[in-house]
């Protein structure tokens, strides 16, 4: 189970700022807007990253691994 959701949300928001992307953060959910798609992130027991068009999320326990995946999707 992930801990310190506020820290995780802050780190993901910082990543969006670094890439100059628009995002929306509400509760334990973050949506990052790319040019032609969106990335939807949900914080529950895991950090779940949903790509547009995929039903099953990428799930991570570690923030570093989730950030790596987000960077891969963004760039």
Can you annotate each of these PLM segments?
Residues 1-33, 54-68:
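Negatively charged, low-complexity tracts enriched in Asp/Glu with abundant Ser/Thr
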Residues 37-65, 72-75:
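Intrinsically disordered, low-complexity regulatory segments enriched in Ser/Thr/Pro
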């Amino acid at each position: 189970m992930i801990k310190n959701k506020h820290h995780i949300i802050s780190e993901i928001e910082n990543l969006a700022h670094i890439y100059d992307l628009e995002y929306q953060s509400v509760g334990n959910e973050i949506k990052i807007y790319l040019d032609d798609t969106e990335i939807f992130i949900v914080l529950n027991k895991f950090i779940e990253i949903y790509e547009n068009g995929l039903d099953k999320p990428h799930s991570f326990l570690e923030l570093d691994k989730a950030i790596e995946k987000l960077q891969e999707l963004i760039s």
